[in-house]
C-alpha cells in the first residue's frame, strides 16, 4: 500500500504526489475558482517539461521558506538540480524548520547575499550552471552582479524581464514585458525587450504565430503621448525586419489588445486585437502595476524570467508562492534546452 501523504499547499501538488508515488489528499473544499482555471495553463507547461533532464541551477541566498522550498520543489519535479549558495548555517536552519533534507543538494557557503550573487554569476560564466535562481535578496542586488561590466553575464542584447501570465478570462498564457528590470527604456531598449519576449514565446507556444501588442493609453499616434510614438516605431521596425518572427502592432490600449469586441467597437482593425501573446508596456511602473493588478485582483497565475543574459535568470517576487517559482524554473529549462538543441554539436554543454 502506498504511503498516504497530504500535499495541498499549491496547485501543482496533485502532480507531485503522482511523481513521488504518494496518495494525494485534496483540501476539504475544492472550488473551480478563476485561479484554478488559470493554473491549468501552467500545469500543461509543467507536463510538457516532463522528460527533460534537470538543469543545474545556482540558487542565490535561499534563506527563507519560499525560496528554499521553491528550489526543492522544482528539484522534486526533476526540473532543476539546485546548487544552494548562501550562508550555510542559515540555509541549514531554514531547511531544518521546514523538514528539508539537504543531503542530496550541494551547498556553497557565502557569508552575504552579494557574495552569493557573485559566486552564482561565476558559476554561470564557467558554464557550471545553466541558470540562476533568485532567493531571498533584492532584485537589484542580484542583477548588479549579472550586468557587471567586467565579470557579468551581458550579451549583445539588452537584458529584460518577462512575466508569463495566465488568467481565467483569457484563453491562453501571455507575456507582460518589461515590468521588473528596465525602468524607462529607450526605443532601442524596447526593440530588444520585444525580441527577447518573442523568442521566449516561440519556445512556449506550439502554435508558432506570435502576436505582439505595444501598449499605450490610446490607439492613435500623438506627440502628446510619447509612448505612442515608440509603439508606432516598433510596429514599423517589425515591418522592416528589425524585429523578427512576430506580428507587432501598436499603439494599442489595453482593452483593444485583449478584446476583439473593444477593438471593433472603436473601429480598430488589427491582427493582434483580442489575440495578443505579448503585451509590451511603456515602462516598468505601468507594467509592474498591471501584472500585480492581474495577480491580486484577477487571480492571475504568473511566472518570471530574465532574458538576454548568458543564462536564464529565474526572477520572482519575494511574495510569490512556491508553485510560481516552480513554473519559472520550467521556463528556464525550456530556454536552456532550446539553446542546447540549436548548439547540439557544441562541446560546451554542461549537462
From Swiss-Prot:
Record pathway: Metabolic intermediate biosynthesis; acetyl-CoA biosynthesis; acetyl-CoA from acetate: step 2/2
Q: What's a Pfam family in this record?
A: PTA_PTB
Q: Where in the cell is it found?
A: Cytoplasm
Q: Which GO terms describe its biological process?
A: acetyl-CoA biosynthetic process
Q: Which UniProt keywords apply?
A: Acyltransferase, Cytoplasm, Transferase
UniProt lists the family membership as follows: Belongs to the phosphate acetyltransferase and butyryltransferase family.
Q: What is this protein called?
A: Phosphate acetyltransferase
* Upper taxonomic lineage: Bacteria, Pseudomonadati, Pseudomonadota, Alphaproteobacteria, Rickettsiales
The gene name reads pta
Amino acid at each position: 500500500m502506498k504511503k498516504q501523504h497530504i500535499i495541498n499547499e499549491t496547485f501543482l501538488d496533485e502532480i507531485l504526489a503522482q511523481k513521488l508515488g504518494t496518495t494525494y489528499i485534496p483540501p476539504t473544499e475544492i472550488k473551480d475558482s478563476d485561479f484554478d482555471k488559470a493554473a491549468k495553463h501552467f500545469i500543461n507547461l509543467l507536463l510538457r517539461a516532463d522528460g527533460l533532464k534537470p538543469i543545474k541551477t545556482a540558487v542565490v541566498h535561499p534563506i527563507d521558506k519560499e525560496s528554499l522550498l521553491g528550489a526543492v520543489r522544482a528539484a522534486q519535479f526533476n526540473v532543476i538540480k539546485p546548487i544552494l549558495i548562501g550562508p550555510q548555517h542559515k540555509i541549514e536552519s531554514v531547511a531544518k524548520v521546514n523538514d528539508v533534507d539537504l543531503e542530496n543538494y550541494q551547498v556553497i557557503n557565502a557569508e552575504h547575499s552579494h557574495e552569493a550573487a557573485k559566486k552564482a554569476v561565476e558559476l554561470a560564466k564557467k558554464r557550471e550552471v545553466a541558470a540562476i535562481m533568485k532567493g531571498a535578496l533584492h532584485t537589484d542586488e542580484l542583477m548588479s552582479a549579472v550586468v557587471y561590466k567586467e565579470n557579468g553575464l551581458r550579451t549583445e542584447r539588452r537584458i529584460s524581464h518577462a512575466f508569463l501570465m495566465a488568467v481565467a478570462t483569457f484563453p491562453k498564457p501571455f507575456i507582460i514585458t518589461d515590468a521588473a528590470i528596465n525602468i524607462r527604456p529607450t526605443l532601442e531598449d524596447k526593440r530588444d525587450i520585444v525580441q527577447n519576449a518573442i523568442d521566449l514565446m516561440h519556445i512556449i507556444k506550439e502554435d508558432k504565430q506570435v502576436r505582439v501588442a505595444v501598449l499605450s493609453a490610446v490607439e492613435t499616434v500623438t506627440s502628446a503621448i510619447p509612448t505612442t510614438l515608440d509603439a508606432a516605431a516598433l510596429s514599423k521596425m517589425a515591418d522592416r525586419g528589425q524585429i523578427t518572427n512576430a506580428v507587432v502592432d501598436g499603439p494599442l490600449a489595453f482593452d483593444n489588445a485583449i478584446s476583439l469586441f473593444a477593438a471593433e467597437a472603436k473601429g480598430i482593425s488589427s491582427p493582434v486585437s483580442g489575440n495578443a501573446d505579448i503585451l509590451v508596456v511603456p515602462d516598468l511602473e505601468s507594467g509592474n502595476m498591471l501584472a500585480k493588478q492581474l495577480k491580486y485582483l484577477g487571480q492571475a497565475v504568473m511566472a518570471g524570467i530574465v532574458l538576454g543574459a548568458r543564462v536564464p535568470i529565474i526572477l520572482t517576487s519575494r511574495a510569490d508562492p512556491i508553485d510560481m517559482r516552480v513554473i519559472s524554473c520550467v521556463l528556464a529549462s525550456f530556454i536552456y534546452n532550446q539553446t542546447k538543441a540549436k548548439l547540439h554539436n557544441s562541446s560546451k554543454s554542461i549537462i
